């Protein structure tokens, strides 16, 4: 820009302002122009005049003071805006606040465009009134009111004025809207006679940035004459909020050996101030790095984006050589584009140097020794390894494999998750007499694959020598269990079998003795020398100690070792049934009426403890020697039931009827049981057995009980 250009601009600006103010003959307090659009130059030069502002309080501007929202500009007493230092960027908006004892107002300067200024002077300074545009045909004239936040006492203070050139006499101004008669109430008020608008308290832009009010004129009775007309109150931002990091904790990870410039994480802060101003324009930097080894500048943060990247060579990002793989960075965010006057906020970024599998595990020695008693199982030795990688990752965790010497799968190896040791275990008992020594070859690897330039070497295998110790093993019965089948009526003293137990310790030449361990019914005896088992009582298949025709007994074989060892053998005796149990009938009591038309007395059932064919079909008979043939009758229903009936009615009394039942065994077995029949008086649906000394059961009840018994078989 030429040196004479500011002067020409100021003259042009003054002429335009004069033309603008000439639209109204009455003086309106405040800036004659509320909004300016200024093209951004390549650089604002110190003490360079940028533009002239025209402010009037209509009373001579006594004690006029200006305040600028940016600390890098000021307004001289003549209204000239100048830069206090050379500066290339100031943000998007500046605000100028003018105040006298009689009036105050705010002007907005919008910075637009690029660095090169082209076009006419009118293109450089574009004047615009924010309201009203275009000018409306109405008598109420309002302009937006700009009020800085955080103003101090005294209150109330005038912040603007409403003009109505055609207002009738005795009419009044009325102000409504949020902040007046709506919550938050009472912030603004208007002088009903003069139209002066005042604020009653300190404003906070971060609570409400714009108040939308309405102005109208009313008569003395409150009736609206004109309006409502919108009145916008804009709260001008002050830099009163520090940047805040709201998304913590901030934890980033970077793989060891990563190339320079690797992005680790992004940290951004929030500033509650106006994002259109430098008050919320943030810049980031690293204030502190802990630890500061091997370089105090391991990381860099993009001042505008907040991206944290590595700035050291991959060799310095070696997790195994670092004193601590965790770095803590104090990140600072500063508003005002990072200028010294800006407010700051800090947060901690924790960066972990993650491990990769660049070290293979190595056994601490080439050979390990172990001893184990024959017959024992469990862990016999722990194999130790070393690995420089991170103990919390699969790059450190070991996986062991038996690659030779385990054809019978008698051994297994697992990793101890706490120590990373290989726990070698015996899972199938070893036999000293078969093999007293075993040699295993063990391989160790990591859970994660190694990086391409690292491989497993000879130190990743080890040999384990295992010595099996001889112990006195108990004798072993063969077969086990031992099974025999005998009839249940086997005579006492009969030999069932001869048991056989052998001593696994064949080299010790020990003797074996036998004894009974469990014989629930007390039926058996065993010869302690030769193991012959015979009976000491009659075997009974129906005994409660027999389960499903099988009797179980246990025997001991004891060797002559010191101390002696014991083996246990099981004998299962299957008992064959013989016809040694007579059948029995049920029920044994019945009732019948003395005048019954149905002469059926009871349905009898029979049961037998023996097994088929020594049970049904049963034969039912009335013992004829004790009962007259012409009174009672028994008829077969099926193989297990028969019907007892009368051939004629009997007087009330108790009768004992001998019933003879015979099973189908060879030879058959017979049982005679008395059936007690009570003949009762049955009158008017009442059964009376008192005269007969009988129980109170009716014939239908007896028949029903008999049928139920039949159904249960």
Swiss-Prot record:
PROSITE patterns: CADHERIN_1, CADHERIN_2. Disulfide bonds: none annotated. Changing residue 367 to Q: In a patient with amyotrophic lateral sclerosis. Highly expressed in heart. In the CNS, expressed in cerebral cortex, medulla, hippocampus, amygdala, thalamus and substantia nigra. No expression detected in cerebellum or spinal cord. Glycans are attached at residues 52, 86, 382, 500, 530, 598, 638, 671. It is a lipid-anchor; GPI-anchor. InterPro entries: Cadherin (IPR039808), Cadherin-like_dom (IPR002126), Cadherin-like_sf (IPR015919), Cadherin_CS (IPR020894), Cadherin_pro_dom (IPR014868). One of its GO terms (molecular function) is beta-catenin binding. The keyword Amino-acid biosynthesis does not apply. Keywords: Calcium, Cell adhesion, Cell membrane, Cleavage on pair of basic residues, Cytoplasm, Glycoprotein, GPI-anchor, Lipoprotein, Membrane, Metal-binding, Repeat, Signal. A lipid is attached at residue 693 (GPI-anchor amidated glycine). GO terms for cellular component: adherens junction; catenin complex; caveola; collagen-containing extracellular matrix; cytoplasm; external side of plasma membrane; extracellular exosome; extracellular region. Residues 1-22 form the signal peptide. Changing residue 113 to R: In a patient with amyotrophic lateral sclerosis. GO terms for biological process: adherens junction organization; calcium-dependent cell-cell adhesion via plasma membrane cell adhesion molecules; cell migration; cell morphogenesis; cell-cell adhesion mediated by cadherin; cell-cell junction assembly; cellular response to toxic substance; cellular response to xenobiotic stimulus. Residues 139-245, 246-363, 364-477, 478-585, 584-694 form the Cadherin domain. Pfam families: Cadherin (PF00028), Cadherin_pro (PF08758). Changing residue 65 to C: In a patient with amyotrophic lateral sclerosis. It is found in: Cell membrane; Cytoplasm. By contrast to classical cadherins, homodimerization in trans is not mediated by cadherin EC1 domain strand-swapping, but instead through a homophilic adhesive interface which joins two elongated EC1-EC2 domains through a region near their Ca2+-binding sites to form a tetrahedral, X-like shape. Cadherins are calcium-dependent cell adhesion proteins. They preferentially interact with themselves in a homophilic manner in connecting cells; cadherins may thus contribute to the sorting of heterogeneous cell types. May act as a negative regulator of neural cell growth. Three calcium ions are usually bound at the interface of each cadherin domain and rigidify the connections, imparting a strong curvature to the full-length ectodomain. This is Cadherin-13. The lineage of its organism: Eukaryota, Metazoa, Chordata, Craniata, Vertebrata. The gene is CDH13.
């Amino acid at each position: 820009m030429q040196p004479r250009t500011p002067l020409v601009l100021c003259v042009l600006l003054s002429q335009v302002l004069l033309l603008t103010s000439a639209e109204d003959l009455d003086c309106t307090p405040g800036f004659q122009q509320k909004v300016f659009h200024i093209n951004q130059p390549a650089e604002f030069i110190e003490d360079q005049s940028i533009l002239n502002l025209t402010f009037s309080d209509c009373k001579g501007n006594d004690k006029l003071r200006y305040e600028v929202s940016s600390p890098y500009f000021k307004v001289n007493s003549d209204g000239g805006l100048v830069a206090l230092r050379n500066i290339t960027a100031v943000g998007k908006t500046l605000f100028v606040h003018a105040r006298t004892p009689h009036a105050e107002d705010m002007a907005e300067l919008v910075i637009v465009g690029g660095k090169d200024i082209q076009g006419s002077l009118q293109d450089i300074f574009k004047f615009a009134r924010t309201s009203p545009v275009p000018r409306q045909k109405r008598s109420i004239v309002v302009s937006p009111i700009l009020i800085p936040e955080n103003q101090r006492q005294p209150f109330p203070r005038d912040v603007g004025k409403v003009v109505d050139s055609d207002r009738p006499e005795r009419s009044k101004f009325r102000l409504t809207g949020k902040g007046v008669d709506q919550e938050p109430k009472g912030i603004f008020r208007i002088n009903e006679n003069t139209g002066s608008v005042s604020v009653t308290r300190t404003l906070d832009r971060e609570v409400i940035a714009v108040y939308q009010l309405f102005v109208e004129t009313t008569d003395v009775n409150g009736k609206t004459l004109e309006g409502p007309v919108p009145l916008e109150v804009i709260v001008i931002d002050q830099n009163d909020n520090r940047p805040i990091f709201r998304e913590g904790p901030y934890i980033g990870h970077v793989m060891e050996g990563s190339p320079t410039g690797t992005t680790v994480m992004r940290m951004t802060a929030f500033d509650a101030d106006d994002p259109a101003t430098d008050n919320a324009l943030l810049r980031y930097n690293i204030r502190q790095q802990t630890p500061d080894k091997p370089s105090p500048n391991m990381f860099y943060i993009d001042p505008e984006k907040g991206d944290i990247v590595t700035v050291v060579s991959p060799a310095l990002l070696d997790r195994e050589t670092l004193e601590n793989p965790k770095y803590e960075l104090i990140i600072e965010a500063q508003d005002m584009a990072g200028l010294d006057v800006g407010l700051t906020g800090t947060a901690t970024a924790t960066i972990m140097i993650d491990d990769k599998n660049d070290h293979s595990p190595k056994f601490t020695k080439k050979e390990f020794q172990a001893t184990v008693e024959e017959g024992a199982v469990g862990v016999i030795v722990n194999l130790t390894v070393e690995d420089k990688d991170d103990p919390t990752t699969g790059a450190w965790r070991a996986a062991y494999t038996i690659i030779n010497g385990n054809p019978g799968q008698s051994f297994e190896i697992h990793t101890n998750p706490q120590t990373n040791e290989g726990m070698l275990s015996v899972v199938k008992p070893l036999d000293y007499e078969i093999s007293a020594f075993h040699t295993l070859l063990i391989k160790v690897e990591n859970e994660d694959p190694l990086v391409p330039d690292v491989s497993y070497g000879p130190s990743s295998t080890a040999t384990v020598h295992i010595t099996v110790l001889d112990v006195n093993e108990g004798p072993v019965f063969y077969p086990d269990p031992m099974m025999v089948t005998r009839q249940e009526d086997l005579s006492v003293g009969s030999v069932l079998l001869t048991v056989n137990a052998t001593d696994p310790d064949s080299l010790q030449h020990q003797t074996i003795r036998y004894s009974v361990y469990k014989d629930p019914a007390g039926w058996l005896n065993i010869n302690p020398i030769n193991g012959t088992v015979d009976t000491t009582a009659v075997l009974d298949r129906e005994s409660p100690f027999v389960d499903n025709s099988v009797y179980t007994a246990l025997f001991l074989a004891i060797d002559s070792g010191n101390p002696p060892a014991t083996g246990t053998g099981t004998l299962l005796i299957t008992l064959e049934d013989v016809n040694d149990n007579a059948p029995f009938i049920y029920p044994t009591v019945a009732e019948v009426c003395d005048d019954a038309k149905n002469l059926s007395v009871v349905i009898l059932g029979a049961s037998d403890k023996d097994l088929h064919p020594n049970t049904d079909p049963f034969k039912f008979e009335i013992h004829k020697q004790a009962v007259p043939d012409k009174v009672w009758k028994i008829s077969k229903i099926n193989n297990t039931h028969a019907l007892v009936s009368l051939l004629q009615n009997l007087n009330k009394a108790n009768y004992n009827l001998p019933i003879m039942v015979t099973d189908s065994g060879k030879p058959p077995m017979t049982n005679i049981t008395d059936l007690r029949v009570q003949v009762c008086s049955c009158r008017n649906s009442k059964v009376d057995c008192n005269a007969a000394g009988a129980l109170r059961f009716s014939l239908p009840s007896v028949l029903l009980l008999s049928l139920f018994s039949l159904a249960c078989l």
